[in-house]
Regions:
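Rossmann-like adenosine-cofactor binding region
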Residues: 145-238
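General beta-strand structural signal in soluble alpha/beta enzymes
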Residues: 54-60, 79-81, 139-142, 193-194, ...
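Short glycine/serine/threonine-rich phosphate/pyrophosphate-binding segments
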Residues: 122-126, 200-203, 222-224, 245-247
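N-terminal ligand-binding/catalytic initiation module
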Residues: 1-85, 325, 331-337, 341
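Buried hydrophobic packing segments
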Residues: 2, 94-102, 126, 248-252, ...
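Adenosine-phosphate binding glycine-rich loop
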Residues: 212-367
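Glycine-rich phosphate/diphosphate-binding loop of Rossmann-like nucleotide-binding domains
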Residues: 85-186
Length: 367
């Protein structure tokens, strides 16, 4: 299910890549080795796959840019140049998805109550973005427990405690009771953000969920049966490959010589427009959002898998794009070509290249 989620993410972005998932299940202390030794050994195990262009490791749960540097060193393909922190990019798409869902529901973030599972790099960044927009963080859980406050938790306090105590921050937040981690799901909130393990929403707890909207950080956060129940309960469930695609979006954009600010621009413009358009279209068709967007994305995957269509299915889509965009389309294509040859170009050329990238990827879903 995790590899499938990655496949859907690439297809949603309209990038011709398949999906895979791998990880290291080990405790360095028990093996009497350093974390860096494990990372490099993992990289050496991937060496032939990386050399053949079959598999490219990336960041996910419990990993950092430093980990990725070590893995790629072990794989014989050391990363060159400044990389984009994929965890921050993931936070951007999760936040923007939530913002568009709230907007589509004719609400304001300033009166939205939020529950967040986990408080790692992505979840804490999402909490900061939400709080900065006025949302009220009612509850936060880690593996050590859940804390909540009807008046809202102070995110800056949570961030300070996270830096000092990690997951045990819940035991150090003042004047709150620590309950079981799973009690987060039954909180009276508008927005629930599952942010840790797969299938945390299941047949045992789905009936207790009070949220109106679920926007996940985690991959595969709900079982298929639980997703069906959420539909029946009238709860809007946003698939993982939509909400948390920021990490691989940043990876793809870094390959085309864009930076984090470019990722932010694309998320706040084309990505935001796409999420809102998909919400509209699914309602017009009378279909659940998750089923509609899965069908559209799978069609993208099939088109991208067809070698006759090129990257990314543009031979079929390019004439209409040219017709729709006229001179702007010509300018953006020229800018993109110049940018590829000279990534340090800026100003109009850089913006044209970014517009072209948007057209080739997320923008083609809107058209």
């Amino acid at each position: 299910s995790l590899a499938m989620a990655m496949t859907y993410k690439w297809a949603f972005l309209n990038v011709p890549m398949g999906g895979a998932k791998a990880g290291i299940f080990a405790v360095p202390e028990e093996l009497k080795c350093e974390r860096s030794d494990l990372r490099e050994a993992f990289g050496r195990g991937l060496k032939s796959l990386v050399a053949q262009g079959v598999y490219f490791p990336g960041l996910d749960l419990g990993t950092t840019l430093e980990d990725l540097y070590s893995i790629m060193e072990g794989a014989g393909r050391p990363l060159v140049g400044e990389q984009i922190d994929g965890s921050h990019a993931t936070a951007l798409t999760v936040f923007e998805t939530a913002r568009q869902v709230v907007k589509y529901s004719h609400r304001e973030l300033s009166d939205v109550r939020v529950g967040i599972e986990g408080f790692g790099k992505v979840a804490s960044a999402v909490a900061e973005l939400l709080a900065g927009s006025g949302a009220i963080i009612i509850g936060v859980s880690t593996i050590d427990g859940m804390i909540s406050s009807e008046n809202g938790l102070d995110v800056q306090t949570l961030l300070s405690l996270k830096n000092e105590f990690g997951d045990r921050l819940v035991h150090h937040y003042p004047a709150v009771e620590v309950t079981a981690p799973e009690s987060l799901y039954s909180l009276d909130v508008d927005l629930l953000i599952p942010g840790a393990r797969p299938r945390v929403i299941n047949e045992k707890n789905v009936s207790s969920i009070e949220a109106k909207w679920i926007v996940p950080i985690a991959n595969a956060p709900a079982t298929w049966e639980a997703e069906k129940s959420l539909d029946e309960m009238g709860i809007l469930f946003i698939p993982d490959f939509v909400a948390n695609c920021g990490g691989i979006l940043s990876s793809a954009m870094r390959s085309d010589y864009f930076d984090l600010e470019d990722v932010r621009y694309l998320v706040e413009t084309t990505f935001a427009e796409l999420v809102f358009a998909l919400l509209q279209e699914s309602e017009l068709r009378g279909e659940s959002f998750k089923e509609f967007v899965r069908a559209v994305t799978w069609q993208n995957h099939l088109m991208l898998s067809d070698p006759s269509t090129g990257f990314p299915g543009m031979r079929k889509r390019l004439p209409q794009l040219i017709k729709d965009r006229d001179w702007h389309g010509v300018k953006s294509r020229i800018g993109y070509r110049i940018h590829r040859r000279n990534p340090k170009s800026n100003g109009v050329i850089h913006q044209s290249a970014l517009d072209r990238y948007a057209e080739l990827t997320l923008g083609s879903m809107i058209n």
